[in-house]
Amino acid sequence: MLDVVEIQKILPHRYPFLLVDRVVELEKGKSVKAYKNVSISEPVFEGHFPGHPIYPGVMIIEGMAQAGGVLAFLSSSEEEQEAAKDKVVYFMSIDKAKFRNPVRPGDKLEYHLEVIKHRGSIWVLDGKAYVDGNLVAEAELKAMIVDK
């Protein structure tokens, strides 16, 4: 549905901090499914952990937040999307975060987010991350669309 070039038109993040490779499904105002291919060549693996590389949980949460940002922007009206060029999504809070299984280089990390609540510029999302259909992380995320 959206490749990395299209995602970069929405999100301000760039390598090495753009953590969404592709959006595969999006239902405006409701949900998004996206993924990241985790590669051993990512800088984070230089120190986390040498000889036993594990993708950091905070990076999984950030990837979910980025997928949620795409959902928030694309759920806006065309007029709001045009105005959104001067806006950015700020992460406000993380609640109920749990890390269930490790993510390793070579894994396809899938993000599934559903809208719990949306009021004005504030979004509350239920985020889950999977590898091979197994839950690896989950959290409730709150974000706000603000002026740059």
UniProtKB/Swiss-Prot annotation:
Family: Belongs to the thioester dehydratase family. FabZ subfamily.
Superkingdom of source: Bacteria
Record localization: Cytoplasm
Chief place where the protein resides: cytoplasm
Molecular function terms from GO: (3R)-hydroxyacyl-[acyl-carrier-protein] dehydratase activity
Enzyme class of the recorded protein, top EC level: lyase
GO cellular component, one term: membrane
Its EC number(s): 4.2.1.59
The protein's role, per its UniProt record: Involved in unsaturated fatty acids biosynthesis. Catalyzes the dehydration of short chain beta-hydroxyacyl-ACPs and long chain saturated and unsaturated beta-hydroxyacyl-ACPs.
KW Transit peptide (keyword) present: no
Name the record gives this protein: 3-hydroxyacyl-[acyl-carrier-protein] dehydratase FabZ
Keywords in alphabetical order: Cytoplasm, Lipid A biosynthesis, Lipid biosynthesis, Lipid metabolism, Lyase
GO biological process: fatty acid biosynthetic process; lipid A biosynthetic process
